Amino acid sequence: MLEAKSLRKATVPRSLLQHPSPGNVQSNRLALHVNDDNSSCWVYIASGCRIYKLEISMQDSLVNRGKESLLIPEQCEVMNSSLVNHCPHRSEIQSIALAETERSDCLILGSVDSYGHLIVSKLDNSGKDVDRLTFSALPRDCGVGEGGWAGICFSPSQWCMAAVARSFCKSIDVYDQDIHLQTIRTLWYPSSLCFMQTLCSGNDSSLLAVTEGCQLSIWDLRMKENGGCVHRICGSLGDIFYTVCSSSTNIAVGGADRTVTIYDPRRWSALSRWVHCSKYEITGLAFSSIDSDYVYVQGVDYEVLCGQWRDSKKVLSFRGDSNWLGFSKCANRDVLGGWCDSGSIFLADITKENYIQSTDGLSNGVPS
């Protein structure tokens, strides 16, 4: 079973950012990176046309619990904070994402604004800004027309490949660095996207999962027939999907129906439905990197919970103190971060509880 090692609450210094810009329902304006020695975590947040970073300690601490096992955060101070040396956008940043290169010696920071303008920078793995590489890419229509929500995701196997979704334009642009590869046209307004990490796609990361309206669509970037769309799954009519995530074996979606649905990509059938797990709409999902039978769920009502989706059982949860402006999970470990419009940042470190096996082969219930 998963348990919390620490839950910390820090406040963005007023000298760095006094009034954050409002966010969309999809909270994509936060990204995390834990330092190599696991002593601290860099939290990247986007407000307006700029990106800021804060360093928060990852020291283990006593975790207090309230009613219904709700985790109570420990107040802490921000160790370091600064403006990221990242080219500013001309309009409000809608989403940011972090990726690691093949050698893991540097980070790739990508951001997209409300008109679909993509900017990518290379940063040092320790969190320092290094002018190694910066490039930008404009959408095919050069960003004309009306702006709106936009999302970004990197390929898990090729950091140079990124997909940018634009809700108002009903389009998804795929880039290899600053080279435009193709444009996908969706039927409805896209709200979330991710490259699939499933066994059926291997390591080529050619499959892209997109939530659009009340549908989950799967796109194969290698195909031209039917625009590349290989499968569509319809949810309840009128219940919009807001988020999608993928593990090595399954894919999950959530949205206005407050239900997490897990699909098997080999047959595209529903394995499990965790009905009404959140009090309000689900706007963020992430599979646990420790055990993919667990999933993290972020709701509009400030709550973040972790549960076993097969048994529809909640194991832990915590709450923000106001609306989420950003929420994210580290790519390869269970560290969660959330940013509220009050200026508070919540950082949770989750681990798996180990049990010592007794001589008769049964667990004695004592943590190792």
Model regions and ranges:
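A common structural microfeature
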Residues: 27-29, 40-42, 48-51, 93, ...
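Beta-propeller domains
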Residues: 1-18, 37-87, 115-136
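Short, flexible beta-strand-to-coil junctions
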Residues: 46-50, 112-116, 165-168, 212-213, ...
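Canonical WD40 repeat/beta-propeller blade segments in eukaryotic WD-repeat proteins
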Residues: 24-34, 88-100, 140-154, 186-201, ...
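Terminal intrinsically disordered, low-complexity extensions flanking WD-repeat/beta-propeller proteins
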Residues: 2-31, 36-42, 59, 301-304, ...
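Per-blade loop-tip surfaces of WD-repeat and WD-like beta-propellers in eukaryotic adaptors/scaffolds
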Residues: 57-64, 117-137, 167-192, 199-206, ...
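Alpha-solenoid helical-repeat scaffolds
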Residues: 91-185
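Structural hallmark of WD40 beta-propellers
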Residues: 39-44, 103-110, 158-164, 182, ...
